UniProtKB/Swiss-Prot annotation:
Homotetramer. It comes from Glycine max (Soybean). This is Lectin. Binds GalNAc and galactose. The lineage of its organism: Eukaryota, Viridiplantae, Streptophyta, Embryophyta, Tracheophyta. InterPro entries: ConA-like_dom_sf, L-lectin, Lectin_LegA_CS, Lectin_legB_Mn/Ca_BS, Legume_lectin_dom, Leguminous_Lectin. Keywords: Glycoprotein, Lectin, Signal.
Length: 285
């Protein structure tokens, strides 16, 4: 147990240091690259630079609440909410062939009144700039049932087993389909703060997602190769989407903070600020 606790503490420290380093590197290349960055430690009603869709609201306490709840805080069935950063992100450039590296960090909680009846989950995603809410429940508001023409790259935190899912709650990487290309088990904790770091290294096309529960001393990590040029348009929006169950409340989803930075190098720049990120993340475990 002592070893497990120490490893988790090391993960938390390493992820925090990694995010700080990544954000500094990404935002220091303004003269040689196209950069976008922001950091919100909490939210405010009528949050600037945010587009809310569906049931999403910002509460008076500063939480981004993605799903409807009743006066007692119990989640309501068939709720779908999304929140987008309003500024489009130039994720790759057709003229130069360059692809952006990025880092996203956020804290979130989910609350389920009955942990034996969970549904459906939350996702961080990149999608076309005109993206609209899609099918709710198991499709998490990201995909249509026929999945025709969907251009979405997402990291999902999925609590309900649909026909295309593994048997347990999981973290998945999704590329233009609700069927994840790779998953790992999610040691979820009800109503506890989860710290998430998602990075994309353009030099290797490696997408890495990690989740840590500091209070529970547990962590999960997942990675796979994703080609953003073949999966997404040149310009995208980023954001969150979360859904409750069709016939059961399942769980509500709240985002507590959110930071993001991206770097699209020009053709003359051969410096990739994330070339060590995946190594640091893997070495932290």
């Amino acid at each position: 147990m002592a070893t497990s606790k120490l490893k988790t503490q090391n993960v938390v420290v390493s992820l925090s240091l990694t995010l700080t380093l990544v954000l500094v590197l990404l935002t220091s290349k303004a003269n040689s690259a196209e950069t976008v960055s922001f950091s919100w430690n909490k939210f405010v009603p009528k949050q600037p630079n945010m587009i809310l869709q569906g049931d999403a609201i910002v509460t008076s306490s500063g939480k981004l609440q993605l799903n409807k709840v009743d006066e007692n805080g119990t989640p309501k069935p068939s709720s779908l909410g999304r929140a987008l950063y309003s500024t489009p992100i130039h994720i790759w450039d057709k003229e130069t062939g360059s692809v952006a590296s990025f880092a996203a960090s956020f804290n979130f909680t989910f609350y389920a009144p009955d942990t034996k009846r969970l549904a459906d989950g939350l996702a961080f995603f990149l999608a076309p700039i005109d993206t609209k809410p899609q099918t709710h429940a198991g499709y998490l508001g990201l995909f249509n049932e026929n999945e025709s023409g969907d251009q979405v790259v997402a990291v999902e935190f999925d609590t309900f087993r649909n026909s295309w899912d593994p048997p347990n709650p999981h973290i998945g990487i999704n590329v233009n389909s609700i069927r994840s290309i790779k998953t790992t088990s999610w040691d979820l904790a009800n109503n506890k703060v989860a710290k998430v770091l998602i990075t994309y290294d353009a030099s290797t096309s490696l997408l890495v997602a990690s989740l840590v529960y500091p209070s529970q001393r547990t962590s999960n990590i997942l990675s796979d190769v994703v080609d953003l040029k073949t999966s997404l348009p040149e310009w995208v929006r980023i954001g969150f989407s979360a859904a409750t169950g069709l016939d059961i409340p399942g769980e509500s989803h709240d985002v507590l903070s959110w930071s993001f930075a991206s770097n699209l190098p020009h053709a003359s720049s051969n410096i990739d600020p994330l070339d060590l990120t995946s190594f640091v993340l893997h070495e932290a475990i």
